[in-house]
Each structure stands twice: as structure tokens, then as C-alpha cells.
Amino acid sequence: MARYTQRPENALKRANEFIEVGKPLRALDTLQEVFRNKRWNYAYSETVIEPLMFKYLYLCVELKKSHIAKEGLFQYRNMFQLVNVNSLENVIRGYLKMAEEHTEAAQAQSSAAVAVLELDDLDNIATPESILMSAVCGEDAQDRSDRTILLPWVKFLWESYCQCLELLRVNTHCETLYHDIARMAFQFCLKYNRKSEFRRLCDKLRKHLEDICKSSNQTTGVSINKVETQQLCLDTRLYLLDSAIQMELWQEAYKAIEDIHGLMALSKKTPVPKTMANYYQKLAMVFSKAGNQLFHAAALLKLFQLTRELKKNLTKDDLQRMAAHVLLATLSIPLPSAHPEFDRFIEADKSPLEKAQKLAILLGLPQPPTRVSLIREVVRLNVPQLVSEDFRNLYNWLEVDFNPLNLCQRIQSVVDTIESGPAETSLLTPYIQSLKDVTIMRLIRQISQVYESIEFKRLLELASFCNVFELEKLLVESVRHNDMQIRIDHQKHCIYFGTDLTESQREYRPDGPTLQSMPSEQIRSQLVNMSTVLTRAVSIVYPDREREQRAKLRTQMVHHYHEIKDREHQRILQRQKIIEDRKEFIEKQNNAREEEEARRQEEESRKAKLAEQKRLEQEQEERERKRHQNEIQAIREKSLKEKVQQISQTAHGKKMLSKLDEEGIKKLDAEQIAKRENEELQREAKELQSKLKSQEKKIDYFERAKRLEEIPLFEKYLTEKQVKDKEFWEATEQTRIENAITERKDAVSQQERLKRMYPDRDEYLEALKKERASLYLEKVEKFEIALEVERKKRLADRVIRRREERRQAHLREKEEERLRKEEEIRMAQAAEERAAAEARRLEREAEDEKRRAQYEKQRAKEEEAERKIKEDRDRLAREVAVERERSDKERDTWRPRGDRPEGRPSAAAGGGGASEWRRPAPTADRADRDRGADRDRGADRDRGADRDRGADRERGADRDRKDNEAGGASDSWRVRREPDSQRNAAPKDGGGSSGGAQPSRDDKWRRGGDRERDRDFRNDGQGPRRGGDREDDRDRGGFRRNDGPRRNEEQQRETGGNWRDAPRQSDNRDNRRPAGGDRRDRDRDVRGAGPKEGGGGGGGNWRTAPAPRDEKPTTKQRDQPQDKENKAGDDGEWTSVKRR
């Protein structure tokens, strides 16, 4: 394994290196590691991964590792099934092509091996080994060779097909590839005759189709509701049907027919006529092979009707041939049994009937056909008149004419025509035996109506195309299945018909030509015949009575007709109108259903596209994020790897790295590695210093002295050795010089001896040249000719090669141009997608900016409203101050209590105190109270400004504005109400308080709301509010100038003291305010009704009159309680004040 995770291109390069050195398993492991690594799955495009995938699959095919190829294909599908489907398709097709090529090569190799074995020894072909092997296993040499060489590759190819089908079965982008691979698998089964694999393949495809039908209502994946999917599935099943018929697997063919019928029934569009014709043709073939001649004829009849109605270029010869085929198939149907065996013995079993009904559904028939119904349909379509002259009388001979003596001869002529006819009539040959059996049965029935007994020899003469055994078998079968009364006498060699008078043939008349009834039939119908004869006799004896009855009946019928003709006519017209309305209604319903279905499908498609687009965007973002992370990680790893390589070049670096494992190195970065390197260097330097110091200590004085004594001896030895070496060299050099002089002398003497041979050498060379001159010239001439031929050949080859090179260069240019255009198209599509994404981003930003602007606008409006409310509040405060000054001036006068009107009750009557003169509080007290009120008002503003701003916005400001515009008593709440102690209070010793006690003037510590006029403005006893004073004034009955009684005044409660002893309303505000907040209290205060129109309460003026209110209380306000009990403490005792 590699030390670090390799990049795909590096892995491919390393895999090629492994392949070159003959290690494919190592190469496959290297490539497989790339696909298993999740880091690289989505970081590279298909241009990088696709070559690696081809190499990976090539190695899997070479090594027959189908399970490893499956793993890689599934990983590749997950990576590129939504990015580039063409790449996935190319990879799968290339993988299957490689597997097929290797399988074909193995087949050729197996055949070649068998051929070599057969040609090994021509004299002894059957060797003892081959004889023993054939005796043991029963196989020949080809089978054994295929099992050894071919079978492993066939198994690998089959597994490859199954893996690819499983890979693509739910991928909506690869439906075409899925069905192409299914057809390739069918061809594989046909080529190698793999019947068991074909059955498993059919089951697998049927399971896939069932899964698609179950999940058809999902928004993703393959949907069977799509027209394209239905057509692809139908074409694949038709191909499956053809393959099953070729392999003679009739059970699989029948299942394929059921699947085809289900797909055609599921489709909303009518199949094309060509498909239906192919379907009926294959269905007729399957019924023929199954021996079901009835449904075989019915399928051929449906095919004939379809071809005759829809095929425009149908020739007369084709029509005659098809008509003859249908006629012979229909007439060859065996005669039906009067009492079938399942009716006799298995009467409760409905399986045969259900099976027939199921087969009829495959043909599109409402009920199972019968021989009589098919013959009737053949006659209706005028098929007997459309056939050629040879078959035109066949229907009359078998079904109409009664001629038992010549029946078999006539049928034999038709049989001879079929057998000796052209090749076109070969399709009719399978019907000959069935036609003969039907003819024999017709002959036996007709003979039984003419003769009571007949000899075997005579019957065999009439039935010319069967022998005695076949005839006897047919007689027994006719008795068994058709309830014919036949008795065979083998002693007399004759046959008896209808001799038993106790049995009847059937309850209905038999089909086919008849001459007379059988004796048993005559016995059964004797009473019927007697009734017929008697009826005829009565009509002869009384001819007029029957005529009168008929005339009377005719008159009644005419009279009845005239009575009901108008009603019936209207009913018929109404029925026609009802039918038309019903048709229109059904048509509208169908149109509405189709539109709804189209809308639903469009909506589902739109949702699916949106979901798919969103998912693709998310995946794209995820891939970009992972790619960015992988790039950062790769940069880090690259720098780390470079740093490690740099450090490993030094000795201390190797030593430091040897102490770390791979995981430890991966956890470190470059800085940490450099730091450890520096630490290692420092540690080694310290160790070296310590070693040097320890060695220095070990060297002693004796060692140094010994070496000093050795120095002169070494110098003397070297001097003597130098002298000896010089003497040896001089002796050696003298010897070499002497040897060289001797060798020179010997060489000169040898040369002098050889100079005498020069003339002989020259003569020999001249003679040799003269002898071989002609041979040399001949060879030169041949060489020149061969050279010229070779030159011309090479020139021609060079011309052809250059032409081919130019053609290949042109093709490469075209291919490069095509690839360049495809790349440009892809880049343009990518640019469009990026532009669309950018447009969506800009649109989202515009929407955000629009919402931000709306928010700023709304915020500006709220600030403007708050500013206006603040201005109104300041203006109202100024007006209150002015009105307070005016009210203080009006109260500066003394007023006797006896000056009140007579109609107003006295304070003593209401409160139980003595009648006396009371005067208001001194000016100083009023000033104190005014200052307290101002102080309290400020506290109220400080305390409830934020809370009252919403109430002002909702109720107060608008109501004040309306009052000002209407010109009403807008300043009524500004008039300072006189204290209850000055208007209707009792004397200090026995006075009470009406409508709530006033606080003491000495209560300088009290907060806002203690005084009645301040509470009216800031707090109504249920929470601070503004703008609601008019409603509160209505509750109190309005302001009064004099001391008259208030209209809503309650009976005063005795407190046992003066007005100071009365409980203050503001002493316990928390108890007065219930759970639910200030808004509910304000709503309840607003709901309070004012004084009735025109009722001033005695003594009020226009300033104190409340403004009229038009709004009505809401349901929420009406449901809330009108009374509330507030409790507050005063002077050590508990009192209860009930407010309305």
C-alpha cells in the first residue's frame, strides 16, 4: 500500500507501472484504493476519473474479478449519474464489450484446442484416453474443452450482465442503456444456449418491472406512467418473447405474453398496428406449440382482422395466403366434446374455465371462444371466398354438405395440394393431421345417420387416409367424448350405430351437416313431435278460430300501439337525449380527468424538477466545499511530504523520522517537524560533546609516550624500504630492454624469409580475379535489378502509407473538431447554468433589498406616528396646565351648602352627616395638591410612557382628533372636578364619601393617581392610560358646576370619619388590576356607557358634556364583567369599594 493517499492521475500512472512489470493484482489494488477513498470521489471531473475507470475495469476483466468490478461501477454511478450520464454509459458499454471479447476469444481458443487434439494422430483418432473419458463422463472433447476454457468466461460475462442490470434498474437517466443491456443478455443466452440463465434473467426483469410499478407514484426514479418507459419495456418484452420462442422455452414465452398484455393495458395510448400484429403472431405460435388449437385459431383470426383493416398495401396473394391459414386453422379445431371430462368428474373445479377466460383476456375477447363461434366469425368475414381455388370448397365439404361417401376423397385432394404445393404452403402442413381427424369424425357422424351397421372394410374404404388402428381409436374417442352410440363387433368385423333406444345423444342439435335424427333422439323428442302434430291437426279442423284469434290479437295490438305510440315516441326521444347527455357527461368527465391527470403530472414533474435542481445545487455546493477542503489538505500534505523528504536526506533527519510512524507523521505539520528536527540536532550535539569529553579522559600519559618512541623506528623502516624498491625496479627495467631487442631481431629475420613469396601471391590473386570477374558482374546485375524492384515496391508502399497517414490525420482532425465542439457546447451549457444561478442569486438579493426597504419604510412610519403622539401629548399637557389654572380661579369663592337646588339630595341624606357650611380647602392646600398632581403626572409619564404609547396610538389620539374635528366638548375632561368633600360630603364628624374617598392633603408622599382629577387623566383604577378620560367621565356621570347629585352615584358607605378616612383608590393598584394586563382593563373602561343623550345630570355645561361615540362594543368587550371589587387599606382597617 502507498504511504500516502494517491491522487487519481498518480494512481493511474502507478497502476500502469505495475502492469508493465507483470503485477496486475497490485495495479488493481492501487486503483481500487482510489475509489474507496471518499476524498477524491467528488473532487475530480469525469475526464480524470474515466480513464482510471477503464483501466480498473480492464484489470477486473483480465483477472475475472466481477465482484470488484461491481463495486467500482456502483461507486462510479453514484459519482456521475447526475453529472454526466454519457460517461457512465461509455464505461458500462466498454466493460461489457471487453467481457464479450474475452469470452469470444475463449470460445475460439476452445475450438482450436479441440481441433489440435483431433489432428494430433490421424492414424489413431480414438485414443484409449478419449475412449475412457467418453465412457466415464459421456462428453466429447469439445464439451470438456468448453467446460475448462470457455465456461469461466461465460460465467463472468453472465455476472457482468446481471450487475449492470442491477446497477441501472432504478436510474431514470439510463433507461435506454438498461434495455439495451437486457437485449444483449438475451443474445448471450441465445448464442451460448444458456436456458437456465435465460429463465433467471426473465425472473429478474419481471421483478424489476414489479418494483417499478410499486414505486410509480414517487417523484423520483423510473415511473411506469411515462410513455417512453412503457414503450421501452414493451419493446424489451417483445424481444424476450422472440428469444424464448427461438430457444423453445414456451413457459417463459407465455409469461412474456402476459407481461406484454399488461403493459399494453396499462398504456393510455393504443399500441401501433405493427406491434399488435407481432403480438398476435407470437401468441398464435405459442398456442400452436402448446397444442391449444382453439386459441391458436382465434389468435390467427385476430391477426387477420387487424391486417385486413389497417394494412394499406396488402396484396391479393398475401390476403389469400392469410385467409387460407385462418380457414385451415379454424376447421382443424377438434370437434367439441358433449360432456368434457372435467364436467363429468370434476364438476366443482372451475380452474379449466378460469384458464380459458384468462387466455381469452390475452386475445382481447370478452369470453372464451368456441369452434362454432370461430366458424361463424370466419363466415361473417367472408374468409371462405377469399382463399384460393384449392381451398374454397373446404368449408362446404366439412360444415355444410352431407356426402359421407366422397368426403375423405375431397379432403385428400386438399391434403395433396398442401403437401405438393410451393414453399408458401409449408405453413399449412401442421394442420394436415388435425384436418384428417376432424374429417374422420365428420365421416363417422354422417355414417351413423345413414347406416345402422357397417363393415370395417367398407368404413376403411371410405376413410382412405387412416388404418384400422387409427380408425378404432377415433371410434373409441367419439364414444368417450361425443356421446355417440357405437358398438364394435370384432367377430363379424362390423360396427353398429344408435341401437340403444334408452339413451339420447344430446339435449341440443349437433353441429355440422345432418340428414336425420338418431333413433335415441327420436325417442327423446317423441312428445315434442306429438305436440307439433296435434297443433297442426287443430289448425286444420278449426281453421277460422285461429284466424279470428289472430285478428283479435292484431286489433288489440293496434289499439295498444295507438295508445302508447306518443308516449313511446317521447320516451325514445328522451332516451336519445339522455344517451347524448350521458355521452357528453362522460366525455366531460374524461376530459376533466385527463386535464387533472395532466396537471397533476405536470405539477409532480415541476416539483420533481425543483427538488432535483435543489438537490443538484446542494450537491454542487457540497462538492465545491469538499474540493476546497481537499485542495487545502493536499497542499498541506504536499508541503509536509516535501519537508519530510528534505529532512530524510540528513542522518539526523532519518533518525528522527525512524522514531515516528505514518500516523504520527500525518498528525504533524511542517513547523512541528522542523521543531523536532532542531531538537534532534541539539540533542545529538550534546551527546557528541559528552562523548568527546569521556574519550579525552580515557587517553593517558603512557599511550602518548609509547607512540613517541615508535616514531624513529617507523622512519628508519621506511628509508630502508625505499632503497630496496629502487634496486628492484632497476633490475626489472634492464631485463625488459633486453627482451625487446631480441624480439626485434627475430621479427626482421622472419620478414626477410617471407619476401620471396610476394610474386607467387600476386600471380594467384590475378588468376583468381580473372576467373570470378563474370560471376561478380552477374551478381552485380542481379543486385541492381533486385535493388530497382525493391526501390519501386518501397516507393509504392510509401505512397500508400502516406495516403493512409493523411486519411488518418484527416479523421483525427474531424474527431478533434467534434470533441472541441462538444466541449464548447458543454462549456456553453455550464456558462448558462452559472448565469442562471447568478440570476437566481441576484433575484434573491433584490427580494431581500425590497423587504429591507419595506421594513425601513414601515419603521419610518412608526417613528412618524410616535413623533405625532409625543407632540399631541405635549400639547395636551400644556392645555391641562392652562385649564388647571382657570379651574383654580373658579374655585376661589365661598359657597353655602343651602344654595343647592331642591331636587338634589343633601350630603347628610346621602352620607349620614350634619348639614353645615363647608368651604373648599385653602389655596395653599390646593397648590400643594396641584404640585403633587404635577409631580404625579410626571411619575406617570416616567412609569407608563412606553406602555401608554400603544394605547395612545390605538385609542386616545384618534379619539381626541375626532372630538376636535366634530367641535364637541373636547375639553370636558380638562375641567377640574371639585372634590367630593366640597360638593356632597357630610360634616367632618359624620360625613361619608361618594364614589370613592379622596386622599388627605397632607399626603405629600403619594404618587400619581391619588387624586380624582389626576386619576381621571392618567389612571382609571385599572392601569395607566391616555385618551380614555371621556369614557371615565361617562362612568361618573359627567362633570357638574354645582353640587347636584351624580346620576350614577352609589350610596355612600359610612367610614366613621371624615373624607380623609375614606380609602384611596390608588393605595392598592395591584389588587384592582386583574390578570390579563392593562389592555383588557382599558377595553372594559371604553365599554362603559356615558350619560344618556340630553341628560346633563343637572348643572353641567358644554365643556363637561361627553363627546358622542359611534363605535359599538365588540363581543370580547361585552363578554367581560362590568363590575370589579377593589380592596384597599386605610388607617388600620379593611374597606371594600365597589366600582361600576
UniProtKB/Swiss-Prot annotation:
One of its GO terms (molecular function) is mRNA binding. Residues 590-632, 826-1140 are annotated as: Disordered. It comes from the Eukaryota. The keyword Transport does not apply. Residues 1091-1101 have a biased composition (Gly residues). Residues 590-624, 826-903, 925-965, 1000-1019, 1026-1053, 1061-1087, 1108-1130 have a biased composition (Basic and acidic residues). Keywords: Cytoplasm, Initiation factor, Protein biosynthesis, RNA-binding. Its main location: cytoplasm. It is found in: Cytoplasm. Pfam families: eIF3a_PCI_TPR-like, PCI. Residues 319-502 form the PCI domain. GO terms for biological process: formation of cytoplasmic translation initiation complex; regulation of translational initiation; translation reinitiation. RNA-binding component of the eukaryotic translation initiation factor 3 (eIF-3) complex, which is involved in protein synthesis of a specialized repertoire of mRNAs and, together with other initiation factors, stimulates binding of mRNA and methionyl-tRNAi to the 40S ribosome. The eIF-3 complex specifically targets and initiates translation of a subset of mRNAs involved in cell proliferation. Component of the eukaryotic translation initiation factor 3 (eIF-3) complex. The eIF-3 complex interacts with pix. Belongs to the eIF-3 subunit A family. This is Eukaryotic translation initiation factor 3 subunit A. It comes from Drosophila willistoni (Fruit fly).
